[in-house]
Amino acid sequence: MSRVAKAPVSVPAGVEVKLDGQLLTVKGKNGELTRTIHNFVEVKQDNNELTFSPRNDGAEANAQAGTTRALVNAMVIGVTEGFTKKLQLVGVGYRAQVKGNVVNLSLGFSHPVEHTLPAGITAECPSQTEIVLKGADKQLIGQVAADIRAYRSPEPYKGKGVRYSDEVVRTKEAKKK
């Protein structure tokens, strides 16, 4: 069995877990998340713990058990604490504004870029060059952050572009004559 899958997922107070066949629903103060569990994985619920085990002895079943455990743990953390992802805009004139569920970006193009946020994700701008994304679904937050970063990813000479706040951009040296 996978080392990750051996550890049970503890369900804190205030979180409701419902298992209906292969459909797992986790409900908490930050919302509700649903995921279909792979057929190779068996989930057991005992009081405030979820345990994951592979249905057979294959390598793929072991891998799926560990992956499923990690995803469900992220769901539980998401509905209790939530996840945040911070982006920085580096460059002259690069700005961001949030209006409702739309992030308006000025990234040096001849036109402003508007990115509509999916349901369950909120954004705020503490300053004109920072975007903070919040939500319960870890995968969705990461995808939205990657989509925004893709509009203008950091270039290797000056480092201008949209980057994650913890990202280190390695810069190249300019060509010498």
Curated annotation (Swiss-Prot):
A cellular component term, taken from the record's GO annotations: cytosolic large ribosomal subunit
InterPro entries: Ribosomal_uL6-like, Ribosomal_uL6-like_a/b-dom_sf, Ribosomal_uL6_a/b-dom, Ribosomal_uL6_bac-type, Ribosomal_uL6_CS
Organism, as annotated: Mannheimia succiniciproducens (strain KCTC 0769BP / MBEL55E)
NCBIfam families hit by this protein: L6_bact
Subunit structure: Part of the 50S ribosomal subunit.
Domain of life: Bacteria
Keyword Ribonucleoprotein: yes
Task of the protein: This protein binds to the 23S rRNA, and is important in its secondary structure. It is located near the subunit interface in the base of the L7/L12 stalk, and near the tRNA binding site of the peptidyltransferase center.
Keyword annotations of the record: Ribonucleoprotein, Ribosomal protein, RNA-binding, rRNA-binding
Lineage: Bacteria, Pseudomonadati, Pseudomonadota, Gammaproteobacteria, Pasteurellales
GO biological process terms on file: cytoplasmic translation
Name of this chain's protein: Large ribosomal subunit protein uL6
Family indicated by similarity: Belongs to the universal ribosomal protein uL6 family.
